[in-house]
Regions:
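Conserved phosphotransfer microenvironments
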Residues: 52-56, 60, 64-86
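The C-terminal output helix
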Residues: 135-146
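C-terminal output helix
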Residues: 124-132
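A short, hydrophobic beta-strand element within the central beta-sheet of small alpha/beta folds
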Residues: 93-103
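Alpha4-beta5-alpha5 "output face"
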Residues: 109-113
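Conserved acidic segment of CheY-like receiver
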Residues: 9-32, 49, 69
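Walker A (P-loop) phosphate-binding motif
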Residues: 145-166
């Protein structure tokens, strides 16, 4: 079985932008396209919650890694809920970068507690975002891929106690 990264030249990364303006989405897309990744892009113009769930394509769900860019400027409370939702939806394979034009230390701390891996200032500086992507690429490249189904659990239930099913 061949590794999909070797066959296609790079790992499959889902790039999700949440409530970001067009200029930010364009900047993020252009910089991420320079990485050696196969990008699966999704742009959402609303925050996520339990009541308002997004639709992710199957390719985005099956991607080896996910990168979410969440803009905190419009509604920080809903942005925090979105970060928590993404963290639980893509458990252990997502990196979340928060963006805000206001450098509020309390907001940065709350976003990190909710699941953000990094927090950058708006307007997005290409050099800072490239450094973040390079760190993530190094991290994701060092993780050894495991098969999805590594084992099987078989359990037996006896009809009544004392029949030797242990």
């Amino acid at each position: 079985m061949t590794d999909p990264r070797q066959a296609s030249g790079g790992m499959n990364v889902a790039l999700i932008t949440v409530n970001a303006d067009e200029a930010t989405v364009l900047c993020v897309s252009e910089i991420a396209a320079q990485m050696r990744w196969n990008l699966i892009q999704s742009a959402f113009d609303y925050y996520f919650s339990v009541d308002k769930r997004p639709y992710f394509t199957q390719k985005a769900i099956d991607a080896e890694a996910c990168l979410a860019i969440v803009d905190f400027d419009k509604d920080p409370k809903l942005a925090l809920e979105t970060v928590a939702f993404l963290s639980s939806s893509f458990y252990h394979k997502i990196a979340i970068v928060g963006l805000s034009s206001a450098a509020n230390p309390d907001l940065v701390l709350e976003s990190m507690r909710a699941g953000c891996n990094d927090f950058l200032d708006k307007p997005l500086e290409a050099e800072a975002f490239t450094d973040t992507l390079n760190r993530l690429d190094t991290l994701w490249s060092s993780i050894v891929a495991r098969p999805l189904h590594a084992g099987r659990i078989i359990s037996f239930f006896g009809a009544k106690g004392g029949v030797g099913t242990t």
